[in-house]
Amino acid sequence: WIMGHMVNAIYQIDEFVDLGANAIETDVEFSSSGKAKYTYHGVPCDCFRWCKKWENIDGFLEALRRATTPGDSKYRKELILVVLDLKLDYVYLSDAYDAGKDLAQRLVKHYWNGGRNGGRAYILLSVPVVEYYRLITGFRAHLMNEGYKDLLAKVGYDFSEDTYLSTIHDGFRNAGVRDKDHIWQSDGISNCFARTLTRLKEAVSNRDSTDGYSNKVYYWTVDKETSITDAINAGADGIMTNHPDRVINVLKDDEIKKKFRLARYRDNPWKTFRK
């Protein structure tokens, strides 16, 4: 999965897919009352990027629905996964559950079209801090209680906090998410800094272990082709990048293409790939 990083303006959906992304990452800014408001990252962000592009969240989700709905004039069949990076800086911990419900309501209405012929992309909720696990609980509860339980098949979960994997595992348990139940484990740092592959390799080992909790692993934000190659060889399922075309170039390498290819819609993002 090639995850186009920081796609927060509607026009960027096409821009990043044109560069080769089959997934995008979008930042979702919440108000202090736990309402999803904008697609916005803000300062600081990755080097060589403009940090302040934004859209109203409802309008963005509607545009995203069109981009992922077969038959729509805006449909992009390549776009199969969307990572929602949830910005919770202004949300009180006590409001995390309600924030999850609010996000679920907006996705049902503006992306899934009330469960009728909505967007087909898989949705990965990326929560920045483990202690906000109740956001996941609230999200899941809304879908189950309001008659949309079937949509949970399209939803996965990630805690992006740079902490012990055991702590993240506890967070999923507290959220009511079972081991290997649509879980991605992320690792990484801004492209402004260098990072070793130590934690990525630990996450890959956990994924491949019979008693591990995750299904997939992605690495962010990787822009150098040498770093992309290293991450893929280390076992990453997804590469989050500002330059999807560079990942495409890496996948053309004779040695890489013997073992890896670009994910397609029929490739289940919640299932661990076995060599």
From Swiss-Prot:
On tissue specificity, the annotation reads:
Expressed by the venom gland.
Q: How is the cofactor bound?
A: Binds 1 Mg(2+) ion per subunit.
Q: Where in the cell is it found?
A: Secreted
Q: What is its EC number?
A: 4.6.1.-
The reaction(s) annotated as catalysed by this protein in its Swiss-Prot or TrEMBL entry are: an N-(acyl)-sphingosylphosphocholine = an N-(acyl)-sphingosyl-1,3-cyclic phosphate + choline; an N-(acyl)-sphingosylphosphoethanolamine = an N-(acyl)-sphingosyl-1,3-cyclic phosphate + ethanolamine; a 1-acyl-sn-glycero-3-phosphocholine = a 1-acyl-sn-glycero-2,3-cyclic phosphate + choline; a 1-acyl-sn-glycero-3-phosphoethanolamine = a 1-acyl-sn-glycero-2,3-cyclic phosphate + ethanolamine
Q: What top-level branch of life does the organism fall under?
A: Eukaryota
A Gene Ontology MF term for this entry? metal ion binding
A Pfam family annotated for this chain is GDPD_2
Please state what class of enzyme this protein is.
lyase
Question: Where along this sequence does the record place binding of Mg(2+)?
Answer: E25, D27, D85
User: What keywords is this UniProt entry annotated with?
Assistant: Cytolysis, Dermonecrotic toxin, Disulfide bond, Hemolysis, Lipid degradation, Lipid metabolism, Lyase, Magnesium, Metal-binding, Secreted, Toxin
Q: What SUPFAM superfamilies does its record include? A: PLC-like phosphodiesterases
According to the UniProt record, one GO cellular component term is: extracellular region
Q: Which GO terms describe its biological process?
A: killing of cells of another organism; lipid catabolic process
Q: Which family does it belong to?
A: Belongs to the arthropod phospholipase D family. Class II subfamily.
Q: What is this protein called?
A: Dermonecrotic toxin LhSicTox-alphaVI1ii
Q: Specify the species.
A: Loxosceles hirsuta
